[in-house]
A protein has these predicted regions:
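A Zn2+-metalloprotease active-site environment signal
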Residues: 2-5, 17-269
């Protein structure tokens, strides 16, 4: 009877999964519908806690915002990108955005749900990116937040957890769980994105950069630099799922598509 109740409860939770459209297509035409089991509010609240945990932990080691010029540069780029996020979702410019630079040799950057950005000094020091290239990185990471890829991945993880929980209960095996804040940290810092998520972030990222007055072709030169790191293996944070050549080709196509937006926007900056 208990097993039956667990099964019914789990199936009910799965049935409650919503199909949503998180963003408008934009010029790049990203319009995939997504299945969500958890609300934006829940994920964003957990992401805010997760971000504070990560930043506070780094600050205690003296690893946050050590170089004033670096921080000013990163935040200036963020302040140009954030207003144009409204192209894809009207609520995004009003998010409680935060941008910090973390001192680490790791070539990394990320944006947690709700607009919590971190750029690592290893990325800046090792790649020596131009502003266009740095905008490409940040636009890509912001795109993950706009598309709510974090929420989608949490939903997938919870769905898998429900299924495993039912199977475990039937087998008499207890399934340990991870709280939402810990799950957000794990997915953001430790787990690579899927090919589908990376491609969407690439395409939306170049449009964000272009609309903010950054040359979208910076994404191409950035990826070429990425490919030279580690003997041709790009960093983990930009998943290796899309092959190097396919990714470059896709970036060329979509950078060209949004080039008129850049030509118009750069006159304002």
């Amino acid at each position: 009877m208990i097993h039956r109740c667990l099964l019914i409860a789990s199936l009910s939770a799965l049935a409650a999964c919503q199909t949503v459209q998180t963003t408008t297509p934009g010029a790049v035409g990203v319009d995939r519908q997504q299945s969500m089991m958890v609300s934006s509010e829940e994920v964003n609240a957990s992401a805010a806690k997760a971000y504070q945990q990560v930043v506070t932990g780094a600050a205690q080691k003296g690893q946050v915002n050590r170089d004033a010029a670096q921080v000013a540069r990163v935040r200036a780029i963020a302040q140009r990108l954030i207003p144009v996020t409204g192209t894809f979702r009207p609520d995004a410019p009003g998010w409680k955005w935060e941008t910090n630079v973390i001192s680490s040799k790791e070539v990394n950057a990320w944006c947690m749900p709700g607009g919590k950005i971190a750029v690592y000094t290893g990325l800046i020091d090792r790649l020596q990116p131009t502003d266009n290239e740095l905008a490409a990185v940040m636009g890509h990471e912001i795109a993950h937040a706009l598309r709510e890829h974090g929420r989608e991945r949490v939903s997938q993880a919870q769905g898998q957890g429900l299924i495993l929980g039912v199977l475990g209960a039937v087998a008499g095996v207890s399934q340990g769980g991870m709280d939402l804040t810990a799950l957000v940290i794990d997915l953001t810092l430790n787990k690579p994105n899927s090919r589908e998520h990376e491609t969407e972030a690439d395409r939306i990222g170049v449009e964000l950069a272009a609309r903010a007055g950054f040359d979208p072709r910076g994404a191409i030169t950035l990826w070429e630099k990425m490919g030279k790191l580690g003997g041709g293996q790009p960093p983990e944070f930009l998943s290796t799922h899309p092959s190097h050549s396919n990714r470059i080709n896709d970036l060329r196509v979509y950078s060209a598509k949004v080039l008129p937006l850049y030509e118009s926007a750069r006159l304002k900056h």
